[in-house]
Amino acid sequence: MFSAIIVLFTGSSCLKDEVIPDSFVDTRLQEYFDRFAEEAAKRQFIVDFEVLKVSGYVRLITSQNVIGQCAHDPGTPTTVIIDKSYWDNATDLEREFLVFHELGHCILNRDHLDEADLFGNCISIMTSGTAQCIINYTPATREGLIDELFMF
């Protein structure tokens, strides 16, 4: 039994050197991916993008009125794509909101939620952006909206 365990460890260490990364995260997105993982951990979720094989890119999206996408294609990493034009002009909170929204689709398998509170504000980061609710993602509302993101 002991020799079998040694063979397993030896075999896995050899394979580790040959592994090609299954995911890539654009350096511009890395901070926001890290924040998502930190916020998940605060809420007892473990998010490991390499294990989950999630990639992230900032690219030009040519579809009208689309600023972010989550692509699930069999055999390839799940991919978050953020529109470069939007990204270049967005504030830190707008970037975070969008990345968290797309990771909500890609990691948490969340659908859009377009419900509003009594004041007409969207109650979720997972709003489609085309609903009647108002996106109100500010330092004051951030924590509650992130709580909702992970409480599904």
At which residue positions do the language-model features occur?
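C-terminal motif of bacterial Sec signal peptides marking the signal peptidase cleavage site
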Residues: 9-13
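Metalloprotease/metallohydrolase-associated module, dominated by Zn2+-dependent proteases
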Residues: 14-52, 61-90, 110-152
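Residue-level detector of short, conserved catalytic/binding motifs and their immediate flanks
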Residues: 95-96, 124
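Active-site recognition of the HExxH zinc-binding catalytic motif
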Residues: 96-110
